[in-house]
């Protein structure tokens, strides 16, 4: 029997999510943080935006979060690529309001985390 495991959401910026990127794959687990630009209660679909890039978020599995357009949210979930238009939508498994976050500092922490993990991988290969 196949082992079912929930993968951690890889933190990315919306600028890194485009059709030829490593993150633009069906089922990949992602963590995204951006401003909510629109939300439909009827469909539970929101649109987040950061740096001129946007992403649809399906929030049907999220409870106890009230969505306010203009607030900043962080979502963790799996990316689905809708065919035939190759449009990405994140099926969120969790989400939270992170108003007050410094987005420039957040982007920098993502860069530093990747640098650290890369250095750790390299040092582990030497041992």
UniProtKB/Swiss-Prot annotation:
Q: Which InterPro entries match?
A: NA-bd_OB-fold, Ten1_animal_plant
Q: Where in the cell is it found?
A: Nucleus; Chromosome, Telomere
Q: Which GO terms describe its cellular component?
A: chromosome, telomeric region; CST complex
| One Pfam family matching this protein | Ten1_2
Alphabetized, the UniProt keywords read:
Chromosome, Nucleus, Telomere
Where expressed (tissues)?
Ubiquitous. High expression in meristematic tissues and in vasculature.
One GO term in the molecular function aspect is: single-stranded DNA binding
* Record GO biological process: response to heat; shoot system development; stem cell population maintenance; telomere maintenance
* Subunit comment: Component of the CST complex, composed of CTC1, TEN1 and STN1. Interacts with STN1. No interaction with POT1A, but competes with it for STN1 binding.
Family the UniProt entry places it in: Belongs to the TEN1 family.
* Functional note: Required for the maintenance of meristems and stem cells through the reduction of DNA damage. Promotes telomere integrity by maintaining telomere length and proper architecture of the chromosome terminus. Negatively regulates telomerase repeat addition processivity. Hampers contacts between enzymatically active telomerase and CST complex.
Name of this chain's protein: CST complex subunit TEN1
